[in-house]
From Swiss-Prot:
SUPFAM superfamilies, per the entry: Aromatic aminoacid monoxygenases, catalytic and oligomerization domains
The protein's role, per its UniProt record: Involved in the synthesis of catecholamines, such as dopamine. Has a role in serotonin signaling. Required for normal explorative and foraging behavior. In response to food, involved in promoting the dopamine-mediated suppression of crh-1/CREB1 transcription factor activation in cholinergic SIA neurons. Modulates male mating behavior by controlling the protrusion of copulatory spicules from the tail of males during hermaphrodite vulval location. Plays a role in modulating tap habituation in animals.
Gene from which the chain derives: cat-2
Lineage: Eukaryota, Metazoa, Ecdysozoa, Nematoda, Chromadorea
GO biological processes: cellular response to amphetamine; dopamine biosynthetic process; dopamine biosynthetic process from tyrosine; habituation; mechanosensory behavior; negative regulation of locomotion involved in locomotory behavior; positive regulation of male mating behavior; regulation of locomotion
Activity control summary: Inhibited by dopamine with an IC(50) of 32.6 uM for the unphosphorylated form and 43.4 uM for the phosphorylated form. Phosphorylation leads to an increase in the catalytic activity.
Name of the featured protein: Tyrosine 3-monooxygenase
Organism: Caenorhabditis elegans
Root EC class: oxidoreductase
């Protein structure tokens, strides 16, 4: 489970979680687990709230600039923003929808053209639609701020039957909007994506298992402070875990052991066995992150990066694009080893690491990360939901039985048994459907998505990616650990050049194999 998803891993009974530190969380219903889905939804609503507050303020400011107050009463919120952000020098392109109860459409159109012309607004396109009660006219226009305001004032004053005046910014497939959304282009820029924005702390919530434990709180703060200091290029420090922490790790490790044999997918079992054989994961001692990274780098190129808690959904997903997983370093409280109200190191190591050792699951996680770069808030929320339901709580079919592939299940004894039972509903994994699935969290989840295999899930995810409306594509360069945005033919040529070199080597190897076979 990522430090981003701040999940409550339930082993016995449901427990509430109060999330502190952000106004969004304070105003939200306290969830049983503070999930990636919940976080992304909160961020979307938070941004919408900010935009709404700005619009209200801008509407007040425009009151002093516009003589006819009737316009402001009729004008939509987007229209307010179009006018507010325009200037008197550079013309902008926009659309207007006008509605009139004038029984004669020709009179309405005539008034529009006359008043727009008087205000020197350039009309590029006109469409009309009418019925018995009213007429609608859509116009594509070009004008400066003063010209736009003047045309609105004239039309409102001269056409008394006008009932609707809506302005919309020109949409260029959201290209300009999305191109302005910052995202990291090099792995070093993940330093800007590692700020913890929400914390579920034992210092603030009495329902946290560690609440009131001064030693645990101090230990947790020490580990979080270390994580905050980590920067790209730093060697991940050695953590001297206490005997109490090792005992907590062992208790969870051994309790999940038998269940892992019967309830988890073959990929997980195979990689867990290798991790155990190579002594990366053992029951007695908590592994060091840097040792785990050496293993992952050889297997799939993934690596763990220390962070202090909950990141934004956008930042967490962006990290996956570089095959970086932001991980907490603290452990759950020793008095509640089989229940964690948030992601902790035990979840990261027992849930995610064996799955990140699989090339297909690693690729699927990176694909979700790449899809998130430059995406809108709405798409971030959808991608977070897909990630949650497949990478964290996904199931697959093996030999006619349900097996866990999601890290949230693989590290949670109680929910793992529940998910694979007949109690919840199970649906075939379809990213388009999963992306809009409402997340329920009053108790164990009532619904889980099931993939035929990890390969099947990856194929469906890539098909879903092709349907996303984004004005550019991105390619990850593993040599420089950087992201290339493909926006022009020149960018495409560069990407093809690298692909051509790889294909040449593969073709050469294939030719040699043919020669060997014929001999």
């Amino acid at each position: 489970m990522s430090s981003l998803t701040n999940n409550t891993f339930m082993e016995e009974e449901p427990r509430g979680v109060t999330v502190i530190a952000t106004k969004v969380a304070e105003n939200s219903k306290n969830p049983r687990r503070y999930s990636l889905v919940h976080q992304a939804s909160c961020e979307t609503q938070h941004h919408k709230g900010i935009r709404r507050q700005n619009t209200i303020q801008h509407r007040k400011q425009l009151t002093d600039q516009m003589r006819c107050q009737k316009i402001l009463q009729q004008l939509n919120d987007e229209g307010i923003e179009v006018i507010f952000t325009a200037n008197d020098v550079t013309p902008i392109e926009f659309s207007i929808i006008l509605t009139s109860t004038d029984p004669t459409l020709s009179n309405f159109v005539s008034d529009i053209l006359q008043n727009m012309s008087s205000a020197k607004v350039q009309i590029c396109h006109v469409e009309t639609r009418g019925n018995e009660a009213s007429h609608d006219v859509l116009l594509a226009c070009k004008a400066t701020k003063n010209q736009l305001i003047h045309s609105a004032e004239l039309l409102t004053q001269n056409h008394v039957a006008l009932t609707k005046f809506s302005i919309f910014a020109k949409k260029l497939s959201d290209e300009k909007n999305q191109s302005q959304i910052w995202f990291p282009r090099h792995i070093s820029e993940l330093d800007q994506c590692s700020k913890c924005i929400t914390k579920y702390e034992p210092t603030t919530d009495p329902r946290h298992p560690g609440h009131g434990d001064v030693a645990y709180i101090a230990r947790r703060k020490f580990l979080n402070d270390q994580a905050l200091e980590f920067k790209f290029g730093d060697e991940i420090g050695y953590v001297d875990y206490t005997e109490e922490e090792h005992a907590t790790w062992k208790a969870v490790y051994e309790k999940l052991g038998d269940l892992h044999l019967s309830h988890t997918c073959a990929v997980y079992r195979q990689n867990l066995k290798i991790l155990q054989e190579e002594k990366v994961l053992t029951a007695d001692r908590i592994p060091q992150i840097r040792d785990v990274n050496k293993f992952l780098q050889k297997k799939t190129g993934f690596e763990l990066r220390p962070c202090s808690g909950l990141l934004s959904a956008r930042d967490f997903l962006a990290s996956l694009a570089f095959r970086v997983f932001q991980t907490t370093t603290y452990l759950r409280h020793h008095k509640s080893p089989h229940h964690s109200p948030e992601p902790d190191l035990i979840h990261e190591l027992l849930g995610h690491v064996p799955m990140f050792s699989d090339p297909l699951l690693a690729q699927m996680s990176q694909d979700i990360g790449l899809m998130s770069l430059g995406a809108s808030d709405e798409h971030i929320e959808k991608l977070s939901t897909v990630y949650w339901f497949i990478v964290e709580f996904g199931l697959c079919k093996e030999d006619g039985k349900l097996k866990a592939i999601g890290a949230g299940l693989l590290s949670a004894y109680g929910e793992l048994m529940h998910a694979c039972s007949d109690a919840p509903e199970h649906k075939d994994f379809d990213p388009a459907v999963t992306a809009v699935q409402k997340y329920e969290d009053d108790d164990y989840q009532p619904l889980y998505f099931v993939a035929d295999s990890i390969h099947d899930a990856l194929a469906k995810l890539r098909k879903y990616a092709s349907s996303m409306d984004r004005p550019f594509s991105v390619v990850y360069d593993p040599f420089t650990k950087s992201i290339e945005a493909i926006e022009s033919s020149a960018d495409l040529e560069k990407a093809f050049s690298r692909l051509s070199n790889d294909l040449s080597a593969i073709t050469h190897a294939a030719d040699r194999m043919k020669i060997s076979i014929t001999m």
